[in-house]
């Protein structure tokens, strides 16, 4: 998993509440267990017209936001089913950070396990960030996970909080497998000691 230390990029505004995982990645795209290629299906029902052409009114299709790395969204982001394809699709598109006033628990935890930083802010701070994100190509935010700070295009900053363990994992690029591998020497020592004490096993 890629480390997340500091991210600077365009933030796209998505002022919609209760965005569920089916909206993030529709069920038609759940036939694969690969984490790549899902970016094309991200918000597919809103991004594409019925004939498959891009919907010019959807924010991620607008020229200023086609390479967005940050999403500023309404309350209760990631609700609905627990599909892990939702963070996979966001990451494959290029989104590394989602900012909202609240997240569904399963989606929130899945983000950390896949290298995405979900940030919870107050409604007042979200309003400011939504305004920043509405500036098109000038909507550049910097997310500093070490300093726990969001810096806007005008230099203003907002502090945020993240669980210390989850922060450690993102800063060091550790998913569940990476965390296990950190204990590799201890695991090897345990297996050798077990083999020596129980040679018949």
UniProtKB/Swiss-Prot annotation:
Record keywords: Amino-acid biosynthesis, Branched-chain amino acid biosynthesis, Leucine biosynthesis, Lyase
The protein's matches in CDD domains, at most eight in alphabetical order, are given as:
IPMI_Swivel
The GO cellular component terms are:
3-isopropylmalate dehydratase complex
Q: In which pathway does it act?
A: Amino-acid biosynthesis; L-leucine biosynthesis; L-leucine from 3-methyl-2-oxobutanoate: step 2/4
Q: Biological process GO annotation list?
A: L-leucine biosynthetic process
A single Gene Ontology MF term assigned here is: 3-isopropylmalate dehydratase activity
Name which cysteines form disulfide bonds.
Answer: none
Q: What is its EC number?
A: 4.2.1.33
Catalytic reactions on record: (2R,3S)-3-isopropylmalate = (2S)-2-isopropylmalate
Pfam families the UniProt entry points to = Aconitase_C
Domain of life from the UniProt record:
Bacteria
Family membership noted in the UniProt record: Belongs to the LeuD family. LeuD type 1 subfamily.
Alphabetical list of HAMAP family matching this protein = LeuD_type1 (MF_01031)
Describe, as the record does, how this protein assembles with itself and its partners: Heterodimer of LeuC and LeuD.
Recorded hits in NCBIfam families, A to Z, give:
leuD (TIGR00171), PRK01641.1 (NF002458)
| Protein task | Catalyzes the isomerization between 2-isopropylmalate and 3-isopropylmalate, via the formation of 2-isopropylmaleate.
Q: What is this protein called?
A: 3-isopropylmalate dehydratase small subunit
Source organism of this protein record: Sinorhizobium medicae (strain WSM419) (Ensifer medicae)
């Amino acid at each position: 998993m890629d480390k997340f230390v500091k991210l600077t990029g365009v933030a796209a505004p998505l002022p919609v509440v209760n965005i569920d995982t089916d909206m993030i990645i529709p069920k038609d795209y759940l036939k694969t267990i690969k984490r790549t290629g899902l970016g094309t299906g991200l918000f597919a029902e809103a991004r594409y017209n019925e004939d498959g052409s891009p919907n010019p009114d959807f924010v991620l299709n607008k020229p200023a936001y086609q390479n967005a790395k940050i999403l500023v969204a309404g309350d209760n982001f990631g609700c609905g089913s627990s599909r892990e394809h939702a963070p996979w699709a966001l990451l494959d598109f290029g989104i590394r950070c989602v900012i909202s006033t609240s997240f569904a628990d399963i989606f929130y935890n899945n983000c950390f396990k896949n290298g995405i930083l979900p940030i919870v802010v107050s409604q007042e701070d979200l309003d400011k960030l939504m305004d920043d994100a509405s500036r098109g190509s000038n909507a550049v935010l910097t997310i500093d996970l070490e300093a726990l700070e969001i810096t806007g295009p005008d230099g203003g900053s907002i502090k945020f909080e993240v669980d210390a363990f989850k922060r450690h994992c993102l800063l060091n690029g550790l998913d569940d497998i990476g965390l296990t591998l950190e204990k590799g020497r201890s695991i090897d020592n345990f297996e050798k000691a077990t083999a020596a004490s129980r040679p018949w096993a």
